[in-house]
Regions:
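Bacterial Sec-dependent N-terminal signal peptides
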Residues: 18-44, 117-131
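Surface-exposed binding patches on compact interaction domains or structured appendages
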Residues: 43, 62-90
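N-terminal carbohydrate-binding accessory modules
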Residues: 126-186
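Aromatic-rich peripheral "rim/lid" segments of glycoside hydrolase catalytic domains that contact
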Residues: 421-507
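A short beta-strand micro-motif common to beta-rich folds, especially ectodomain repeats
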Residues: 89, 99-112
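An active-site-proximal structural segment forming one wall of the substrate-binding cleft
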Residues: 167-187, 202-233, 237-284, 306-322
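Solvent-exposed, low-complexity, repeat-rich "mucin-like" stalks and linkers
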Residues: 39-69
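Active-site region of glycoside hydrolase catalytic domains
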Residues: 256-387, 396-417, 443-446
Length: 507
């Protein structure tokens, strides 16, 4: 009986315990409700000041999707992964090599959401103080704005250079008097020597050709102009000319043979002009390229190193002749005379330390000299809306890399094919391009030489400014020349590269 009672009591207690434990179940945790997708893009920063040297910073972006960002070319964007409608965006700003501050508004966009903007303001590069002027800047001021006697003594027919074979009249004293009167300070006289060079090992230059070149240089000297004299279409562009870079790169023995001819030719030229004053400068080559490769596609350093060797041969040959050549200014280009390959150019060892770097600029090709002959250029047009920034960045980089380090640089050729004055829009943008490039060159202390091939009219290859025989303006060229000389000579505080930019023609 007692056992039965005890068992019943035990069962009751067990049931009571179970009832107490199970009678009230804990409520389950509620399922979290996801945050709704934002209807507007928001940024952790909406403005940022950046030093001229450039830099990077992060922005936290609230957005329904990874944002698309509208930005200028000098700003780059890197997005992280999107988590809970949040992404970290890394913003990188390139160095500002220009003398003017710049501002950009970045627009962050995402489908289905209102966009947001971030304004970046970057400081200008520091201008050299007047007391910081170095020899490179002083040399730029000496050469200043120059003019090319193009397609003249450099003209060539059937392998023989001839002054008038490309349609220009013979140069006269009036030619250079006119150039001087137009406002130019210097002239570059391109000369092709091929067809007038004898056999190895002397490689004797014909007296008649040498004397004609000497006479033309004398015209410029009498007019009070500084002169650059070079070897021009002796270069090979797939035409089997004697300055055959491709053969030299591909065959060491051929390279040595060509270097001997370079030394012989430049020794003769230097001896002919050794008593000329400091107004005369000698330039080694024009636009050396490998075969027909205007853009070197492979073994770039090897190709450029051969040019470096040739430039050293040139400097050594000229300096060895003595006289005024011991201290005369010399100029050397790199591959294709292109600024894109200057990083491969080695400044030759020069005991006088008076060697300048040369480059040419016809940027952008499709606007200046290419077949497209686009109707406009720059921020106010429809083509190359970043054109001004590209020119400033190029010249600013050259200034910082060379000129600020006391290595003088000059732009041996620049220009743009003439546009028809009857097309008011095309004409106004043509003048604007010339003005902007010339003012930029002056701003960055780069002496600049306008390419003039004597071709009259408008359209591709029409670069006639000063008549090569009379020295008078060609067609409508006076307006273009006046724009150039104003850009170079007007140093008033109210006329800067920025004011030129702000006066761009309207499309």
């Amino acid at each position: 009986m007692i056992q039965t009672f005890t068992k019943c009591l035990s069962c009751l207690l067990t049931m009571l315990a179970l009832t107490l434990c199970c009678g009230k179940q804990p409520e389950p945790e509620p399922t979290p409700t996801p945050d709704p997708a934002p209807k507007a893009v928001t940024l952790s920063e909406t403005s940022k000041n950046i030093a001229a040297e450039g830099g990077s910073f992060d922005v936290t972006v609230k957005t329904p999707f990874v944002p698309q960002v509208e930005k200028p070319t000098w700003v780059s964007i890197s997005n992280g992964s999107l988590q809970n409608y949040t992404v970290t965006t890394k913003v990188t700003v390139e160095a500002n090599t220009t003398y003017e501050s710049r501002t950009a508004t970045l627009t962050f966009k995402a489908t289905g959401a209102t966009s947001a903007t971030l304004t970046i303001t970057q400081e200008a590069a520091k201008k050299p103080d007047p007391g910081e002027e170095n020899d490179a800047i002083a040399r730029s001021k000496e050469l200043a704005l120059g003019w090319n006697l193009g397609n003249q003594l450099d003209a060539i027919n059937n392998g023989v250079s001839s002054e008038t074979c490309w349609g220009n009249p013979k140069a006269t004293q009036a030619t250079f008097d006119g150039v001087k009167a137009a406002g130019f300070t210097s002239v570059r006289i391109p000369v092709t020597w091929m067809g007038h060079i004898g056999e190895a090992p002397e490689y004797k230059i014909e007296d008649a050709w040498m004397n004609r070149v000497y006479e033309v240089v004398g015209y410029a000297e009498k007019a009070g102009l500084k002169v650059i004299l070079n070897t021009h279409h002796d270069e090979d562009h797939g035409d089997n000319h004697w300055q055959h870079l491709k053969n030299a790169v591909d065959n060491a023995e051929t390279n040595e043979t060509i270097k001997k001819e370079i030394a012989a030719v430049w020794t003769q030229i230097a001896n002919k002009f050794k008593d000329k004053g400091d107004f005369l400068m000698l330039e080694s080559f024009n636009e050396l390229i490998y075969g027909t490769e205007w853009a070197a596609s492979s073994n770039v350093e090897k190709k450029c190193n051969v040019i470096n060797e040739w430039n050293q041969v040139f400097v050594d040959a000229v300096r060895a002749t003595g006289g005024n050549n011991a201290t005369r200014w010399l100029g050397v280009p790199g591959y294709a005379a292109s600024p894109s390959y200057l990083k491969y150019l080695t400044v030759p060892n020069d005991p006088a330390k008076k060697t300048m770097i040369a480059f040419h600029c016809y940027d952008p090709y499709d606007y200046t000299i290419g077949e497209k002959q686009l109707p406009d250029w720059g921020h106010s047009g429809t083509s190359y809306k970043n054109g001004e920034a590209e020119i400033k960045n190029l010249f600013g980089s050259i200034y910082n890399t060379y000129i600020a380090k006391n290595i003088p640089v000059y732009m041996g050729e620049f220009g743009c094919s003439f546009r028809d004055k009857n097309n008011a829009k095309a004409w106004s943008f043509f003048l604007y391009y010339l003005e902007y490039v010339a003012k930029a060159a002056k701003t960055y202390h780069i002496a600049a030489f306008l390419w003039d091939n004597g071709v009259k009219g408008a359209g591709q290859e029409c670069h006639g400014y000063i008549d090569h025989g009379t020295g008078k303006y060609v067609g409508n060229s006076e307006a273009a020349v006046k724009v150039l000389t104003k850009a170079w000579n007007d140093e008033s505080a109210g006329y800067t590269l920025d004011t030129v930019y702000n006066s761009a023609p309207k499309n």
